[in-house]
Amino acid sequence: MQDSRRPCIVAGLRTPFARSGTVFKDVTAVQLARRVTQELLERTALDGREVSEVAFGQVIQSVLTPNVAREVSLLPQLPPTVPAFSVNRACASAGRAISYAADQIARGHADVVLAGGV
């Protein structure tokens, strides 16, 4: 790849581990993704206007909110026009979203991509 930029992960955050059916049993995947993303934006002091795109993986998509990335992109810290899409590749969903983000940066299509998964 000529003139490739070298992407880097600037910050990462995740929810604590918990047994299934316990502390997170009443929290939706979208709520988890939004909480973690909000906290990440606050900790890094990243200006949401710098985000070029949002990519999220979701192992089991909800019928009510099939595009978790779009739900995350509606956070008040991000511009409402930021493109967002979700990936579904079973357990590799988040990894694929992060890989896509790195590719977009390496190819010069984006400067900052918010990527993750639930």
What are these regions (language model features)?
Residues 53-55, 86, 113:
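Short, conserved beta-strand segments within well-ordered enzyme catalytic domains
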Residues 88-118:
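Active-site-proximal alpha-helical scaffold in enzymes
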Residues 81-89:
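Short pre-catalytic strand/loop immediately N-terminal to key active-site residues, enriched for Gly-Thr
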Residues 1-82, 118:
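Conserved "HGTGT" condensation-loop signature of ketosynthase/thiolase-family condensing enzymes
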